[in-house]
Amino acid sequence: MKNNTDILIKVIKLNSNNLPLPSYSTENSSGMDLYSAMTQDVILAPGCRACINTGIAISVPNGYEAQVRPRSGLALKFGITVLNTPGTIDADYRGEIKVILINLGHETYTIKYGDRIAQMVIAPVIHASWNLVKDLDDDTTKRGDQGFGSTGI
């Protein structure tokens, strides 16, 4: 369903691949599936990682980014996840989207051409400016500087 928050993203297919373009699985999905464009199977042994080509390059509009995230089913069933999650595709990047996958499971996993390997979420970007101060007293909070489990586990 189209609404006023939809944006148009330019995409090119690389190497004459016949893979589908990234797409939403359901009407309310946040992420679009990305596919492996590797022409040879990639064997991921436990603890190993690989950079997987997707066969596409995109032009993200200024003010947005594309985030590459794991697919929950691959993570739960096989321990396959995106290593640098979320992977960031900046608006000025024009190269092929590649996904670094790691096998955190106990069994070898094979990635084949056309497998759904990750999902991509388009998100707005806000650029911050810094205000250098001597202390953060104006921002006193209940939590303060307590971290790493201080609010419970």
UniProtKB/Swiss-Prot annotation:
Catalytic activity reported: dUTP + H2O = dUMP + diphosphate + H(+)
Enzyme Commission number(s) from the entry: 3.6.1.23
UniProt keyword annotations, A-Z: Hydrolase, Magnesium, Metal-binding, Nucleotide metabolism
Record: residues binding substrate: 71-73, 84, 88-90, 98
CC cofactor: Mg(2+)
Pathway involvement of the protein, from the record: Pyrimidine metabolism; dUMP biosynthesis; dUMP from dCTP (dUTP route): step 2/2
Keyword Protein biosynthesis: no
Role noted for this protein: This enzyme is involved in nucleotide metabolism: it produces dUMP, the immediate precursor of thymidine nucleotides and it decreases the intracellular concentration of dUTP so that uracil cannot be incorporated into DNA.
Protein name per UniProt: Deoxyuridine 5'-triphosphate nucleotidohydrolase
Organism whose genome encodes this protein: Ehrlichia canis (strain Jake)
Top-level taxonomy: Bacteria, Pseudomonadati, Pseudomonadota, Alphaproteobacteria, Rickettsiales
